[in-house]
């Protein structure tokens, strides 16, 4: 199926865009993944329509399964603790996390928004979101960004 990236536990990531050539798979960037999940949680909060919640939870399930893979632990010290920009599905079905997150603080802001949405929906913060948020924050502070707490 070329329409979504499926994780082993049944979670999904939607591609950022699709090619006219059905055989070409693109990628799912973390900031798009978070924006889609946030949008679905916010639709659920506005409407109480469980279809939105169920879809948000499929994305969240994929994030839970892959959370450690998003955190950069490659040999490039400067980018240690940053988050990879995107996930790609290999021809063998494996997930490959790569590319520099050029968005600077956008992904961090999306993670803060996700944390806020989790609190509203579930009444608590979320471990996966907290781990990604803290890692991105650590990287941004090291890079000299002024991080504003919420």
List each model region and its residues.
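Well-ordered alpha-helical scaffold segments within catalytic/enzyme domains
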Residues: 35-49, 91-103, 107-124
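Compositionally biased, intrinsically disordered low-complexity regions enriched in proline and serine
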Residues: 16-19, 42, 53, 89, ...
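Eukaryote-skewed repeat-based solenoidal scaffolds used as protein-protein interaction platforms
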Residues: 1-67
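Long, well-ordered core segments of solenoidal/helical folds
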Residues: 1-9, 51-76, 119-150
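Carbohydrate-binding/catalytic loop surfaces
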Residues: 5-29, 72-110, 149-150
């Amino acid at each position: 199926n070329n329409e979504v990236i499926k994780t082993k536990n049944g979670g999904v990531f939607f591609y950022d865009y699709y090619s006219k050539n059905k055989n070409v798979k693109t990628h799912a960037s973390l900031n798009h993944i978070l924006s889609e999940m946030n949008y679905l949680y916010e639709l659920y909060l506005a409407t109480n329509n469980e279809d939105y919640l169920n879809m948000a939870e499929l994305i969240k399930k994929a994030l839970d399964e892959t959370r450690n893979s998003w955190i950069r632990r490659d040999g490039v010290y400067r980018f240690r603790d940053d988050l990879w920009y995107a996930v790609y599905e290999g021809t063998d079905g494996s997930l490959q996390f790569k590319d520099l997150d050029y968005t600077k603080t956008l992904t961090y802001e999306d993670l803060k928004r996700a944390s806020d949405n989790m609190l509203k929906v579930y009444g608590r913060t979320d471990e996966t979101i907290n781990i990604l948020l803290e890692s991105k924050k650590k990287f941004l502070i090291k890079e000299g960004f002024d991080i504003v707490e919420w």
